[in-house]
Amino acid sequence: MEVKPLANIKSAIKRAELNVKQNEKNSAQKSAMRTAIKAFEANPSEELFRAASSAIDKAETKGLIHKNKASRDKARLASKLA
């Protein structure tokens, strides 16, 4: 995806390009997390729970979601497993 920045300063143009790349990467990571959660909710199993929990932890580690949200999501998934 090409960036057509409004900025005139070279460093600001570079930052705009970086923001686009980081946004794509973060969106993909968050989407993978949501997909893992939906897969577990569709068919609750121990294996899918571990995959969803791992995806949530990765998103938390990368700063995509808050640690409290990660904990809450994992607790809700665990209650569906039990």
Swiss-Prot record:
<dbReference type="Pfam" id="PF01649">
    <property type="entry name" value="Ribosomal_S20p"/>
</dbReference>
<keyword id="KW-0687">Ribonucleoprotein</keyword>
<comment type="function">
    <text>Binds directly to 16S ribosomal RNA.</text>
</comment>
<keyword id="KW-0694">RNA-binding</keyword>
<keyword id="KW-0699">rRNA-binding</keyword>
<keyword id="KW-0689">Ribosomal protein</keyword>
<dbReference type="InterPro" id="IPR036510">
    <property type="entry name" value="Ribosomal_bS20_sf"/>
</dbReference>
<dbReference type="GO" id="GO:0006412">
    <property type="term" value="P:translation"/>
</dbReference>
<dbReference type="InterPro" id="IPR002583">
    <property type="entry name" value="Ribosomal_bS20"/>
</dbReference>
<dbReference type="GO" id="GO:0015935">
    <property type="term" value="C:small ribosomal subunit"/>
</dbReference>
<dbReference type="GO" id="GO:0070181">
    <property type="term" value="F:small ribosomal subunit rRNA binding"/>
</dbReference>
<dbReference type="GO" id="GO:0005829">
    <property type="term" value="C:cytosol"/>
</dbReference>
<dbReference type="GO" id="GO:0003735">
    <property type="term" value="F:structural constituent of ribosome"/>
</dbReference>
<comment type="similarity">
    <text>Belongs to the bacterial ribosomal protein bS20 family.</text>
</comment>
<protein>
    <recommendedName>
        <fullName>Small ribosomal subunit protein bS20</fullName>
    </recommendedName>
</protein>
